[in-house]
Each structure stands twice: as structure tokens, then as C-alpha cells.
């Protein structure tokens, strides 16, 4: 890992696996940091891991990865301390971004293991004029529940991903030019959510893109159905609440009205995407009952997000 005070690339890794748990650990984070430490032809870079006080195991990682900047954040406003929320992830990203020194800012989650060429591919992708560039996401745990969660979250980011301009990019594997983020600083000053930030960027005429070379592998070992369902609800409600900030009242009511239809419609869209990519379609078919169940959890959360304008 080529760490430098004059970093070209700053990578912010958020511990997102604590959405439904009051206490997080670093079991997934270790794999992510290990991959970052073994990058091929890396640019001058830094890695920042913001965390709250209930993350267990940080001290052991400090010894293993001494060049990583582990940042304790004590004053989180949105953290429930009891599990069942994700808004504190946005706060953690905002705090880390204010510390970052790179010209390019990358965001990863602890359960994503980056390809060993990820850093080089990210810097290369930013030679183009896009403000934000997302990458491909693959599943590496061959269990039906993992496939179901993967297809619900990241099916459209499965390679082959078409390089070039895109209307979306996942916050689990994305990078931005620092200059573009600074231009929309009010949108992430208190918390960085990709829906709000991307809307702010595109409203300025900036463009987003996808790169098939920026690959990460989702490795969520130990997934259980109950927590996975609760996670869908929490994230769906957060998504609905955040979208309320960038849409009109009539649009909000219209989305709330059609929310009960979303699980079926989204399941159909996910199936079409899996078929079109010609990869892992049989896994989608096998996992379909779980996919539909998880989408129902998300849809209920999204509906409440639209109605209450509040996350879980």
C-alpha cells in the first residue's frame, strides 16, 4: 500500500454491517483492508475508517494495518445505539471526507472486498470528466440468502457493466472528484448520502458514470434471514425519507400510492436484468422466493419513509 501525505486517492471505508446490530465488529472489515493493502500499482493513497464507540476489534486492526487512519466519531446525531438505523453511516462518511486529502475520494463498505486493481482502475477512470464514477459489484458467498440480498442490492452492478455515463452509482463502490464534492458541500456537510449528493451534482450539470474495471466482491458471511429482512426495512425507509428531500409533495404521495406494487415490479425488473447479463440467472431463479420476501420488507419501509418523511 503506497500511503502518502500527498494522496491522490483517499478511500473511506464505512462499517455498514451494523445496520441491525447495536454492536459492530471488524470481521468483515479485515478482508476489505487486507485487499487494499495488496493493491497492484497503487497510486499515492490513504485509507480512512470512521467508526463509533461500539465497534469491537479496532485496536487489533491498528496493529495489523498501522497506515490506516481509524477515526473515532463520538458525536453522531443519527446513531440510535440500539441498531435499526443506517443514517449514522452518512455522518461517518461526512466526517471522514472532511479529513481526506486526496483529489479523488473513494467510498467502500466493510463487506466489499476490492479487486487488487481497484485503486489503479479508479484513478484511471477519473481521467475522464465525470464527477462521480461507480464500479461493478459481484457476490462471492454462494448461499441462496446471499444471492437474494445481492440481487436486491446490486444485481444491476453485476458485470458486464457498460462503461460510460449512468444515471446511478452504488454508494458501496463509488468515487468522486474532490472538486465536484466541494462544489456541492452543503449536500453532505451533515451527512453524505449518495441520493442527495448525486442529485446535487446532476443539478449542476455534472455527470455520473460506471466502470466495469472498478470491481468489488460482496462477502457477507453469516447472513441470517431475520436480520436481512430488518435491514431491508431500515434501508427502504431511509431511501424513502431521503427521496422526500428532493421531490415535490404530489410526487411523494404518488410514490406512496404505488409502493405496494413495488415488490412485484422490482422483482420483474431484477429478473430481466439477470437474464440480460447472461450470468447467474439460475441463482436468481433459485433465490427468487427470498428476493420477493426481501423486496416486500424494503417496500414496506419505503412506503413509511414517504408517509413519515423520517428514517427508521
Report the location of each language-model feature.
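Short, flexible, basic/aromatic active-site loop/helix in glycosyltransferases
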Residues: 136, 149-167
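Short, acidic, metal-binding catalytic loop of nucleotide-sugar glycosyltransferases
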Residues: 28-44
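Conserved donor NDP-sugar-binding/catalytic core segment of glycosyltransferases
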Residues: 113-146
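Acidic donor-binding loop at a coil-to-helix junction in glycosyltransferase catalytic cores
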Residues: 190-199
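Short aromatic/hydrophobic "clamp" motif used to bind/position activated sugar donors
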Residues: 105
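Active-site-adjacent helix/loop segment of glycosyltransferases
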Residues: 208, 217-294
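Glycine-rich, basic loop-to-helix element that forms the pyrophosphate-binding segment
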Residues: 77-100
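Conserved nucleotide-sugar donor-binding
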Residues: 101-102, 170-183
Amino acid at each position: 500500500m503506497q500511503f502518502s501525505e500527498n494522496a491522490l486517492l483517499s478511500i473511506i471505508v464505512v462499517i455498514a454491517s451494523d445496520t441491525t446490530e447495536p454492536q459492530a465488529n471488524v470481521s468483515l472489515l479485515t478482508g476489505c483492508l487486507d485487499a487494499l493493502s495488496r493493491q497492484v500499482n497503487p497510486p499515492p493513497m490513504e485509507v480512512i475508517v470512521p467508526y463509533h464507540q461500539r465497534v469491537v476489534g479496532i485496536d487489533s486492526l491498528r496493529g495489523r494495518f498501522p497506515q490506516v487512519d481509524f477515526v473515532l466519531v463520538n458525536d453522531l446525531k443519527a446513531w440510535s445505539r440500539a441498531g435499526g438505523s443506517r443514517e449514522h453511516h452518512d455522518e461517518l462518511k461526512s466526517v471522514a471526507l472532511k479529513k481526506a486529502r486526496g483529489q479523488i475520494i473513494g467510498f467502500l463498505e466493510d463487506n466489499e472486498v476490492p479487486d487488487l486493481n481497484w485503486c489503479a482502475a479508479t484513478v484511471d477512470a477519473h481521467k475522464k470528466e465525470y464527477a462521480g464514477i461507480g464500479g461493478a459489484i459481484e457476490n462471492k458467498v454462494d448461499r441462496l440468502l446471499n444471492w437474494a440480498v445481492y440481487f436486491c442490492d446490486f444485481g444491476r452492478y453485476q458485470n458486464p457493466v457498460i462503461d460510460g455515463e449512468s444515471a446511478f452509482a452504488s454508494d458501496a463502490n463509488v468515487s468522486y472528484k474532490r472538486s465536484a464534492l466541494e462544489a456541492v458541500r452543503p449536500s453532505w456537510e451533515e451527512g453524505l448520502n449518495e441520493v442527495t449528493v448525486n442529485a446535487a451534482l446532476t443539478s449542476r450539470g455534472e455527470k455520473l458514470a460506471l466502470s466495469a474495471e472498478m470491481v468489488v466482491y460482496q462477502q457477507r458471511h453469516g447472513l441470517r434471514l431475520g436480520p436481512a429482512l430488518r435491514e431491508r426495512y431500515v434501508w427502504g425507509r431511509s431511501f424513502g425519507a431521503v427521496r422526500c428531500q428532493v421531490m415535490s409533495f404530489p410526487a411523494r404521495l404518488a410514490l406512496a400510492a404505488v409502493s405496494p406494487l413495488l415488490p412485484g415490479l422490482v422483482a420483474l425488473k431484477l429478473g430481466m436484468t439477470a437474464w440480460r447479463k447472461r450470468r447467474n440467472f439460475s441463482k436468481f431463479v433459485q433465490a427468487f422466493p427470498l428476493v420477493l420476501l426481501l423486496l416486500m420488507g424494503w417496500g414496506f419501509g419505503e412506503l413509511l419513509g414517504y408517509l413519515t418523511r423520517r428514517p427508521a
